[in-house]
C-alpha cells in the first residue's frame, strides 16, 4: 500500500487529505476543528489527525507527504519583479525564502501533531507547485482520460496567478503561466475591498450583490484589467497594491488571515471615495459590484477561449479561488467551445492538498490507476450512539426513527414551515453544504429568505440561498440543464417557476443549484423526493449549517447552533428534535407514515 498525506499549510484554507493507493479516503479543512476560524491558515494539525484516523493508519506508515507549494518555482519571474520593485519586491522574495525553510521541518511537525517522535516519520517530502496542485485536484478527480484542457486561476500562489495545461492519461503538461503582479483574482478582491468587503474570502458576497447593480463602470473596469489577442490579461499599473511590491496578506497573532489593501488611491479619481465597512450600501457600490463581475466574466471568457486554442478539446478541468464564481462557471458551458467541465468541490485553496497528493501518486510514486470523485463526503462521521447522547442533552421533544422514515418526517416539517438543521453521515469537503451539514427550508414560502437571514444566519439581506434538486428534474425548473453536484453553477430559473420559488430565486432570476443523484446521497435524495410529493416541487432550500462560523462538523456543534439560533428543528442522524412549540408538528410528521422506504445509508 502507498500512503500519501497531502497538505495545504501555513496558507489560507489549510487542509489535509489522505490518499491510499491512488484513492482519496479522507479530506478535511483545518477550519472545521480547533479554533474554528474561517479560512484558518495555520498548520493543519487537527486535519492531519482526522484524515489519518479516518484512514486507519498512523503517521509512521506514510510513504509521502505532499505539500502544495514549491518556493523554488518561477525564480526568473521573482528576480524580474525584485529588480523592478527593489524594496517591496525584496520583502516578497524574503517571504518566499522563509516559506521554503518552513517546508524543511514539515515531517517533524506532522510527527508532533500525531504525538510521535520526529525520527519515526520516514515519508518522503514532495513539493508541488501551487497552481499545478490546483489543476491536479480537478483533473485527477475527473472522469476524463483523453486530451483535456486544464486551467487554474486565483489571487496568487508560488508567484503565479494563473496556469494553463494539457492533461491526458496520468500526465499534466504545463503550457503557460501568468505571473504576479497580474492577477484576475486580485482584481476582483480589490473591487470587493473598495466597496467595504475587506475581510479575506468575501468575494462570494460581492457576486451576490452584483445583480442589484447596473454596469455603470464598464469603462473603468476595462481600464483596470486589459486583454489582448497575444496574452491572457494585465492589470493597469499604479492601481493595484501588488505593483508596489510585497505580499497581499498576512497572518495575525490569532491565526486569522489579514488582507492588505490591494487598490491604490488612484481608484478614487475614477470611482469616488471607498466605502468603509459597516456603512450603508449605496447604488454606486452595487454598480461597482456589477461592473466588477461583468469584467471578470469577460476576461475569464477570453482566457478560456485562448486555452481552447492551445488545447482544442471539448473537455476542461479547472480550479482555484476564481473557480468558485458560479455565474462564470455556467457561462463557460454556454459561451465557450468547452462542452464538458469538471470541478472538484473544494476548488479554492483547501483543495490543494488533494491535488498535491494525487500529483505525487501519479508522478512520483508511479501510480497508474485513476480516481474519480463523484461525491463530496470525505470528512468525519459519528455513530448513532454519539448522536443519541448529543440529542438527549437538549431535553427537547425528540423521536428516534429508522432511516427509511426520516425523509418523509423531515419533508413534512419543512412543508409545515419549519427551518430544519440536517446533520447526516460524513461531512462535506469544500466550502458548500451539500446535503450532510445543511440548513433546509421550504423554497415556496415568500418570507423564508428573510426569516433565515435575520433569525438564523444573521447575515446580509442581499445574499441568496441555493436550491437542491433531484438531477432528473433540473431541466424542468432551470433554463440550463447542467449537472452540478457540488453547487458550482448559477443558472436561470425558468420564468414560470420564479414566483413559485421565491426563497431560492435571486433578484436576477437565478439560483446556484445543486443537483442530487440517488447513488451519491440516497437519504438526501429521498428527502427531496418526499418534499416534492408534498409540495409538487422536488426542490428544497439549502444553506450551510452555521452561524457566522465554519460549517458545523460535530454533533455538539450542530446542537449548539440549533439551540442558540432560530432553527425550529434538527435532524441529527436518526434523531429528530423540535423546539417545544413545535411538538405537535413532530407528532404529526412521525405518525401515519407509509412503510419505511429502503434506503442504503453509509453509517
Labelled PLM ranges:
Residues 1-5:
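Extreme N-terminal starter segment of soluble prokaryotic enzymes
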Residues 8-29, 34-38, 81, 88-92, ...:
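Flexible beta->alpha loop and helix N-cap segments adjacent to enzyme active/binding sites
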Residues 32-57, 300:
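N-terminal phosphate-binding loop and adjacent alpha-helix
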Residues 43-54, 65-69, 527, 535-537:
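Short HxH-centered metal-ligating active-site micro-motif
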Residues 58-109, 136-137:
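Short beta-strand-loop/turn "lid" adjacent to the catalytic site in phosphate-handling enzymes
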Residues 277-303:
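Adenine-nucleotide phosphate-binding core of ATP-dependent small-molecule kinases
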